[in-house]
């Protein structure tokens, strides 16, 4: 199974790149984790935000591999504690399909992305900066993997 993070935004601060890449490189060869960045639409004073959101959504869905399970990162999604995420990761592995996790831009996810999702995961009821979400998702998935393999990274 391959994990894919599809995220709006291409110019992340160095701390995001460093944190995300640290976890990305920790994933084992049998569970590769990749990042697909979608350019954010230009948001000016007179921007058509609805159209920008639609375009970002179209690009996100086009980046998802055929047959992939789509999981959105969204505040109203299901909150998973770490052991629950580990169980979820195991179910995804048993399903045999690749998993694409979608992080929207400043206005969130396009309705088309939400409609295409099989699951929606809430990291927190708080509104989080999208760059931070990349790092949180990578760390959370790595921690979940460590639980499923009895790797010493996670401690109770």
Curated annotation (Swiss-Prot):
Give TM regions: none
Q: Which reaction does it catalyse?
A: pseudouridine(1915) in 23S rRNA + S-adenosyl-L-methionine = N(3)-methylpseudouridine(1915) in 23S rRNA + S-adenosyl-L-homocysteine + H(+)
The question of whether Secreted is a record keyword is answered with no
**Keyword terms of this UniProt record:** Cytoplasm, Methyltransferase, rRNA processing, S-adenosyl-L-methionine, Transferase
The enzyme's main class, written as a single word, is: transferase
Q: Where in the cell is it found?
A: Cytoplasm
List, alphabetically, the CDD domains matched: RlmH-like (cd18081)
For whether the record's keyword set contains rRNA processing, the answer is: yes
| Protein family | Belongs to the RNA methyltransferase RlmH family.
Q: What does this protein do?
A: Specifically methylates the pseudouridine at position 1915 (m3Psi1915) in 23S rRNA.
Q: How does it assemble?
A: Homodimer.
PANTHER family linked to this entry: METHYLTRANSFERASE, RIBOSOMAL RNA LARGE SUBUNIT METHYLTRANSFERASE H
Q: What is this protein called?
A: Ribosomal RNA large subunit methyltransferase H
Species this protein is from: Serratia proteamaculans (strain 568)
Gene expressing this chain: rlmH
């Amino acid at each position: 199974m391959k994990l894919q993070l599809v995220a709006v935004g291409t110019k992340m601060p160095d701390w995001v790149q460093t944190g995300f890449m640290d976890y990305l490189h920790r994933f084992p060869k049998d569970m590769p984790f990749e990042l697909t960045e979608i350019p954010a639409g230009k948001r000016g004073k007179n921007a058509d935000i609805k159209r920008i959101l639609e375009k970002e959504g179209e690009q996100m869905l086009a980046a998802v591999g055929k047959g992939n399970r789509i999981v959105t990162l969204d505040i109203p999604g299901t909150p998973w504690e770490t052991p629950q995420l580990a169980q979820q990761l195991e179910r995804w592995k048993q399903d045999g399909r690749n998993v694409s996790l979608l992080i929207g831009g400043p206005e969130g996810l396009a309705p088309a992305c939400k409609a295409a999702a099989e699951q929606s995961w809430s990291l927190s009821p708080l509104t989080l900066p999208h760059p931070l979400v990349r790092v949180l998702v990578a760390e959370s998935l790595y921690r979940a993997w460590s639980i499923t393999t009895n790797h010493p990274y996670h401690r109770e």
